Amino acid sequence: RVSVPKTELQKKTDDITKSENHLPELTIPNLYKEIIRNGILYPKIVLAQAILETGWFRSSVYRNKHNLFGLTNPRTGKYYEFNHWTESVRAYYTKVQYKYKGGNYLLWLEDIGYAEDPKYIIAVENVLRGL
């Protein structure tokens, strides 16, 4: 077997590699690493979104459905339910960020109507300042 040198990103995310019996607990560092591991752009903004959407991981949507971003099914309007919070991170990419084509990310979130709150971007910026 040939040994391939690890990239810096792989080295940084090794400590959250998943196995069948071990999934990382939800902490700010683990969430940030999982966001990066999934190739999500603007990881600090996305981290701030998760904190804001869940009220620092206390919301019922997070506790009952492991949904960090308040993602809803456009057909039913119901919140997506995940088996583990890491699935919610992947879903953020596959349901939201894949549409991003460049430019100011916060303005893009506003343009696509990511949140119902007209002051959502200001709230995200406030969380970002505290990180």
Q: What do the PLM-derived regions correspond to, one by one?
A:
Residues 1-131:
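Catalytic cores of secreted/periplasmic lytic hydrolases that degrade extracellular macromolecules
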